[in-house]
Amino acid sequence: MMIYLKLSAKVIMNSYKNVYILGIGGTGMSSIAKYMSQAGFNVGGYDQRKSYITNTLEQESINIDFDLEEITYDKDTLYIYSTAFNLTKTNLSSNTESKNVLSRPEFLQELTRDNYVIGVTGTHGKTSTTALLAHIFHYNKRNVSYIFGGVTSFNGIGGHYGSDNKVLILEADEAFDTFNSLHIDDLLVTNIDEDHLDYYLNFENLINAFKNVIENTSNNVVLNLDNLELKKLKLSKKIYSYSSSDESEITIINSGVISHEGTNFQIETSMIGDHFKSNIAGAICIAYLNGISIEDSLLAIKHFSGVRRRAEFLGSTSGISIYDDYGHHPTEIDVTITALKIHVKGKLYVVFQPHRYTRTQEHLDKFKMSLLKADEAIVVDIYPSGELPIPGVSSKNLEDKNIKYIKSMRAVPSYLRGKVNSGDAVLTIGAGDITLLGPQILKYLDEKN
């Protein structure tokens, strides 16, 4: 679905001094807040609760309200709201047609019209790959702007307004067909997998949405041809690729070696999992097309420590390691469990919080198959993310051999205490508030051991 233009980025930059962001605590909205703040705007916002992200933004002099009654409409303020935010709860609901009230996709559409945009999309891996690409550019003294929905060690929240402000590296989200409303000059596609089918209705529609954004990209397109759906696409556009085939511009020899034009290059990285090596190959390819040598990219990658909540190591106590991950799709859970099991000496315990009733219903059997790869899995109640419950859809439906349902996250630390031993690891995984659980488990085990 295309989004109609309200005003251009030049008008935004020249007409407003104040920006107010609704849902500012989310990773996607906080990156816009940081970008706009660095661009010279007075930025404020609203969120339901305090978090690591809101605390970080407040430390950067961004004022945040936690009471809806604090929000009042001002014609001289630009409002940007998350698609997950319910505007009807505010007095802005009657102003949604106003030029100064934009959804996140509408804002990004305007922003991409006046920049050279390097977009990164794909069902899986787009946040990590966008962050890696931004790091490669910055490590090589290319101070470009970027917006992505994650937190990194190299620059915190994933938003930056660079001195080379005509180039924007952007995570291009396929949800709600957002990426097809953007103007993209260079595009990297990591993969296509079944997701967001509550919106697209079927997989074919999702594939066609990816095909459209590829065909409409102005310049370079880089595809992962190890992904079957990308490989099957019939395209009129010239593409560059990375894959395990020597027909690609970047060939993945194994998990630690890539090749280009007959020369092999060693990858040195702290990131866990073969899927990250694939993302690295894609980032190297599109950086190369933008004038950064493979050697210079690899040097940057060596100093990249990843994105928060991507197989993130939180700490250990009594030989028990705790990890946290954002994965909320069966494929993401599968690859993360597989990667960690290689590194864990003992047993791997996984605590999963399903994200949205529609996704849980859609992928129930696949979630089970992924979770059964752990030595033991625990599932807690579904994180709704603004959705209403669907009758008959519950985390309890995921119970199986070695998959235990525990309704409340608060009961998980004490349950695990009776299970885990030195050498074991615990992975908390999901896109909701389960990210709060890992530190609680670590603290509980530390106090009780």
Task: Report each predicted region and the residues it spans.
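Conserved beta-strand positions in the Rossmann-like core of class I SAM-dependent methyltransferases
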Residues: 44-45, 145, 378
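NAD(P)-binding Rossmann-fold cofactor-contacting core
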Residues: 42-56
